[in-house]
Amino acid sequence: LRRYRPSVPTVWNCGGYESERQIAALDGLIDVYMPDFKYSDPAAAAAYSNAPDYPEVAKAAIAAMKKQVGTTVVENGKIKKGLLVRHLVLPGAVRNTFGVLDALAEIADGTDILSLMSQYVPYGRAAEYPEINRRLRPLEYKAAVAHAVRLGFANVYVQESSSADEAYIPEFARS
């Protein structure tokens, strides 16, 4: 990528669990960072992703991403440079979402984009965790959106509840 610069923005889509060293290695190569910011709660991060340090690692990684790309630039409805952070609101975990949004508000500026997703469908091993073995309630999602607005996020992608449909889950074949 250092030799070849494509005519379209280079996008780094990631889970947010990258080290600052990994992000530093990408400096000057990435136009748009698109990380997840899954957890502010270390207990949830430990239970669902076996990564109790996820909140601190993700916050540091996203801050490093923001420092590299600076102000988010959108032209003709297309992101050219910047930061688009995704967060999936989990059922029964609105406090986790509030914590993610609070942490993100310390990093982001008014140009950055937040994708607040409502598409959670209990699948796979969700039955092992009764607290997330259900769909998101409309009031939980509304509370999350309201908190984002209260914090001053101006560019928020929101979803209809119909996006939480098993039809959107790919068939994962085990080999």
What are these regions, as identified by a protein language model?
Residues L1-T72, Y157-Q159:
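Core AdoMet radical
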